[in-house]
Curated annotation (Swiss-Prot):
Official protein name in the record: Leucyl/phenylalanyl-tRNA--protein transferase
One protein family per Pfam: Leu_Phe_trans
Assigned EC number: 2.3.2.6
Assigned protein family: Belongs to the L/F-transferase family.
Keywords annotated in UniProt: Acyltransferase, Cytoplasm, Transferase
Catalytic reaction(s) noted: N-terminal L-lysyl-[protein] + L-leucyl-tRNA(Leu) = N-terminal L-leucyl-L-lysyl-[protein] + tRNA(Leu) + H(+); N-terminal L-arginyl-[protein] + L-leucyl-tRNA(Leu) = N-terminal L-leucyl-L-arginyl-[protein] + tRNA(Leu) + H(+); L-phenylalanyl-tRNA(Phe) + an N-terminal L-alpha-aminoacyl-[protein] = an N-terminal L-phenylalanyl-L-alpha-aminoacyl-[protein] + tRNA(Phe)
Compartments, as annotated in UniProt: Cytoplasm
Main function: Functions in the N-end rule pathway of protein degradation where it conjugates Leu, Phe and, less efficiently, Met from aminoacyl-tRNAs to the N-termini of proteins containing an N-terminal arginine or lysine.
InterPro entries xrefs: Acyl_CoA_acyltransferase (IPR016181), Leu/Phe-tRNA_Trfase (IPR004616), Leu/Phe-tRNA_Trfase_C (IPR042203), Leu/Phe-tRNA_Trfase_N (IPR042221)
MF annotations from Gene Ontology: leucyl-tRNA--protein transferase activity
Length: 226
């Protein structure tokens, strides 16, 4: 049975109550306050819904993740990285990255990154929890991604690319940096060919929950300004 969240409570139902069809739908309602979003990620769920729908909260089983040590850099991507045709930065323009991620896609109608969603994640960025990766080419933003860093876990949200390999360069650079900072897992939420080509794989939700339990409150050496 689907749980309806109340605005005066930040609690979420146990993950095992999530529906099998559609896979992982856990709850509906609530709001996108910073406090609720932080609680959601710590609990193991995330918001995803289309404009005009109520807020839907998901915790799919299995969960797609990438372990930094398992990053797969193909020969062609390695060549692009060596050529240094792109420049990568962190937290230089979060607003521009999330705006670009909300842009139209050839394979989808509409966007789930609504103005309300953008405002919510920008608040998390102001609090030092949400971070962006920017990929530049000749001074123009051509790719990037954003997500949340909590403890030793990074929760990826969305990425975009306006040039061949731009998002892959940004993601690979982020993963290398996260591994250096002591992060143990990147939450990719749902499988895509793009992420799987970079080394992402699916694990049981119970295993994902174990990582939440053991690593959310451990420190990292992250320095997003460096």
């Amino acid at each position: 049975m689907l749980t309806c969240l109340q605005r005066d409570s930040l609690s979420f139902p146990p993950l095992e109550r999530a529906l099998h069809q559609p896979n992982g739908l856990l709850a509906v309602g609530g709001d996108l306050s910073a406090e609720r979003l932080i609680q959601a990620y710590r609990h193991g769920c995330f918001p995803w819904y289309q404009a005009g729908q109520p807020i839907l909260w998901w915790s799919p089983d299995p969960r797609t993740v990438l372990f930094p040590r398992e990053l797969h850099v193909s020969r062609s991507l390695r060549k692009v990285l060596r050529q240094e045709r792109f420049q990568v930065s962190f937290d230089r323009d979060f607003a521009a990255v999330i705006q670009a991620c909300a842009g139209p896609r050839d394979y989808a109608d509409g966007t789930w990154i609504t103005p309300e969603m953008r405002k919510a994640y920008q608040e998390l960025h102001h609090r030092g929890i949400a971070h962006s990766v920017e990929v530049w080419q000749n001074g123009v933003l051509v790719g990037g991604l954003y997500g949340l860093a909590i403890g030793q876990l990074f929760f990826g949200e969305s990425m975009f690319s306006h040039a061949d390999n731009a998002s892959k360069v940004g993601f690979a650079t982020l993963v290398e940096r996260l591994e250096r900072w002591g992060f143990v897992l990147i939450d990719c939420q749902m499988p895509t060919q793009h992420l799987q080509s970079l080394g992402a794989r699916s694990i049981p939700r119970t295993e994902f929950s174990d990582y939440l339990m053991h690593h959310l409150d451990l420190p990292s050496t992250a320095d997003w300004i460096a």
